[in-house]
């Protein structure tokens, strides 16, 4: 494992992820409080009808374990947005191991590029109020996975919202009424043409006091170019990394003039 190359504190090594779960049933006892408002549950269930998953030819059921819970994720290799990537595993591990330090219980969290939803599910299990966002074609599968793993067993039901990077931000996420303690992102940086819009979206969603946690497997030169631009607008700390898997986890605090 590497030592910290540029961060303000010594990063911790990232494990390869949790061991595969056994065959015990999904926990439903969850946190100390369950959603008591039936209207909230009904609203979340109704929202499921708004999102129709892409008609992939095949899905698989993948199993993960975090926070002592068995998490079942429906995935498909036919879409980047329907697969759990290594950065998501690293970010889940960090949230699990630093729950008290991060003060996640009751925290308002937005995840950028939530994909099949593993990070948002773990954050919800840890007691956060989560808004999971992604492109329209993956929202149905995302909502399915969130409800399957959080309904009746987390303090707050996560919300699903469409977010196209750089588009309609003020209309969909008005700063006057919405504030997030944390913005989470994992493996959103790879070889695509929307990196500038991604960075603009990260900047927009962060207000004074917001902490951005970004985990990514670094594969391409464009990943490092994005990191350079990220550091220009965020005070950046390397929290953890794995030399073997090329995964890095950063904390970003938006710079204010």
From Swiss-Prot:
Q: What is its EC number?
A: 2.1.1.-
Q: Assembly and interactions? A: Interacts with members of the heat shock protein 70 families; these proteins may possibly be methylation substrates for the enzyme.
The protein's annotated catalytic reaction(s) are: L-lysyl-[protein] + S-adenosyl-L-methionine = N(6)-methyl-L-lysyl-[protein] + S-adenosyl-L-homocysteine + H(+); N(6)-methyl-L-lysyl-[protein] + S-adenosyl-L-methionine = N(6),N(6)-dimethyl-L-lysyl-[protein] + S-adenosyl-L-homocysteine + H(+); N(6),N(6)-dimethyl-L-lysyl-[protein] + S-adenosyl-L-methionine = N(6),N(6),N(6)-trimethyl-L-lysyl-[protein] + S-adenosyl-L-homocysteine + H(+)
**Family to which this protein belongs:** Belongs to the methyltransferase superfamily. METTL21 family.
Pfam families listed in its UniProt record: Methyltransf_16
Stated name of the protein: Protein-lysine methyltransferase METTL21C
Give the GO molecular function terms: heat shock protein binding; protein methyltransferase activity; protein-lysine N-methyltransferase activity
Function noted in UniProt: Protein-lysine N-methyltransferase using S-adenosyl-L-methionine as methyl donor. Mono-di and trimethylates 'Lys-943' of AARS1.
Top-rank EC class of the record's enzyme: transferase
Instruction: Recite the UniProt keywords alphabetically.
Output: Cytoplasm, Methyltransferase, Nucleus, S-adenosyl-L-methionine, Transferase
- Provide the residue positions that the database annotates as binding S-adenosyl-L-methionine: 85, 113-115, 134, 165
Cellular component per GO, a single term: cytoplasm
Under the heading InterPro entries, the entry gives: Methyltransf_16, SAM-dependent_MTases_sf
State which gene encodes it: METTL21C
Q: Which organism is it from?
A: Bos taurus
| Transit peptide keyword on record | no
Region named Disordered: 1-40
* DNA repair listed as a keyword: no
- What's a GO biological-process term for it? protein methylation
Primary location: nucleus
The compartments listed are:
Nucleus; Cytoplasm
Q: Where is the composition biased (Polar residues)?
A: 1-10
Q: Where is the composition biased (Basic and acidic residues)?
A: 24-37
């Amino acid at each position: 494992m590497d030592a910290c190359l540029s961060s303000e504190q010594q990063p911790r090594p990232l494990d390869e992820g949790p061991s595969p779960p056994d065959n015990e049933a999904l926990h439903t006892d969850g946190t100390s409080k369950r959603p008591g408002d039936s209207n909230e549950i009904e609203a979340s269930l109704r929202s499921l009808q708004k999102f129709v998953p892409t008609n992939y030819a095949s899905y698989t059921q993948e199993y993960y374990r975090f926070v002592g819970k068995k998490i079942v994720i429906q995935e498909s290799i036919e879409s980047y947005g329907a697969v759990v990537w290594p950065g998501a595993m690293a970010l889940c591990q960090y949230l699990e191991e630093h729950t008290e330090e991060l003060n996640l219980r009751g925290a308002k969290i937005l995840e950028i590029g939530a994909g099949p939803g593993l990070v948002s599910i773990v954050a919800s299990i840890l007691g956060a109020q989560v808004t999971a966002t992604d492109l329209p074609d993956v929202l149905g599968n995302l909502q399915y996975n969130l409800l399957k793993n959080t309904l009746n067993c987390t303090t707050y039901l996560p919300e699903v919202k469409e977010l196209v990077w750089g588009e309609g931000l003020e209309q969909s996420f008005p700063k006057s009424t919405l504030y997030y303690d944390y913005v989470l992102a994992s493996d959103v940086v790879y070889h695509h043409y929307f990196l500038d819009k991604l960075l603009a979206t990260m900047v927009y969603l962060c207000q004074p006091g917001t902490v951005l946690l970004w985990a990514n497997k670094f594969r391409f030169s464009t990943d490092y170019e994005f990191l350079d631009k990220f550091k220009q607008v965020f005070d950046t700390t390397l929290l953890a990394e794995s030399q073997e898997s090329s995964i890095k986890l950063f904390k970003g605090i938006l710079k204010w003039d």
